[in-house]
Design a protein with these regions (language model features):
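Short beta-strand->loop micro-motif that forms the acidic, two-metal-ion catalytic signature
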Residues: 76-83
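Short Pro-Cys-Gly-centered "Cys-loop" motif that presents a nucleophilic cysteine in a tight turn
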Residues: 1-69, 84-319
Length: 319
């Protein structure tokens, strides 16, 4: 069975220097994303997501880019790409056109009219930032939906990395597909699929077009990769702030953040020791910096819900 990447015995410093060099030689890298639609859902079901994955794989092969990570959200897109920005933007324009044609045939014309990439997206400037951005993308579905298994959701690349069971998943080569199956995948009259593609359950496999092996080489270990995705809360805040967003943390993550704030900001050992006024100040920090909902702020800061709702009346009904 194929195993994920392993480095020969080295010190942590040697591994980091090697990965820094790989980052410099492999770039440039960009985090391409669209703003979430406020009043529209892009993907209403798994069939639409499957079509998007297939068209994404086909389109990526047509441009001089590689996808390192991605997440299809219900109302927006995230991609970490390797290549020039102009190629990444061209890739998304072509993908958007193809998806728009598909949605039009489904009676949903115009659903992507307001979906665009920022033409001034800055290049990812360091290895640390690249790791942060990859972790942010992979984590996105997990924090947005309670039913998502971070490492088993098929509409995000999260399950590819450091997965020794990946090579045991069954798939077919495109040469084994019928003409009808190829048309169904490509949504084209004259289907042409890259021979490197593998297909599983009517969908091009993510491992066929996502360069997950490069991502593995850019993280120190599987353990550190998991830490970056699940535990590096400060990095999540940094990426969200850079994008004009607020981090989306669950209760456990907010609780740990609040405990740290109790010690570093207020000089108490725990949240439960904070006086009432300091707990209100903590709620403000959790809301404004960490994106907590009113109910989360009340639970974590140990305040009455009515107190928090009075402090933040505009979001009082958003549980």
């Amino acid at each position: 069975m194929e195993q994920y990447v392993k480095y020969p015995p080295m010190t942590e410093r040697q591994i980091e220097l090697m990965q820094e060099r790989l980052f410099r030689e492999s770039g440039p890298f960009y985090h391409l994303c669209t703003k979430p639609l406020e009043n529209e859902i892009i993907f209403q079901n798994d069939e639409e997501r499957k079509v998007a994955i297939n068209l994404m794989a086909i389109t990526a092969k047509e441009f001089n880019i590689e996808i390192l990570a991605f997440a299809l959200m219900s109302n927006h897109f995230h991609f970490i790409v390797r290549g020039e920005l102009i190629d990444g933007l061209s890739f998304f324009r072509r993908l958007k056109k193809r998806l728009s044609n598909y949605f039009s045939r489904q009676g949903r014309a115009g659903v992507l009219d307001m979906v665009d990439m920022d033409p001034d997206t800055p290049m990812i400037g360091s290895l640390t930032q690249l790791r942060n951005e990859i972790a942010y993308v992979i984590r996105n579905p997990y924090v947005a939906r309670t039913d998502v298994n971070l490492f088993a959701w098929p509409w995000c690349s999260g399950y590819l990395y450091f997965n020794p069971l990946l090579s045991s998943l069954c798939s077919k080569s495109v040469n084994e597909l019928s003409y009808k199956e190829k048309r169904e995948i490509s949504r084209a009259t004259n289907p042409e699929l890259d021979p490197s593609f593998r297909v599983r359950n009517g969908m091009i496999t993510l491992e066929s077009f996502v360069n997950y092996k490069l991502v593995e080489q850019l993280f120190p270990s599987a353990q550190k990769f998991l830490w970056w995705v699940l535990k590096n809360v400060e990095a999540q805040h940094e990426v969200a702030s850079r994008r004009g967003e607020k981090p989306n943390l669950n209760d456990d993550e907010l609780f740990l953040t609040a405990q740290q704030l109790a010690r570093t900001t207020f000089g108490y050992e725990s949240v439960k020791e904070l006086p009432f006024q300091q707990r209100k100040e903590l709620a403000v920090i959790l809301k404004n910096k960490w994106g907590a909902s009113n109910s989360q702020a009340a639970r974590i800061a140990q305040l009455d819900q009515r107190t928090v709702d009075a402090m933040f009346p505009l979001t009082a009904k958003r549980k």
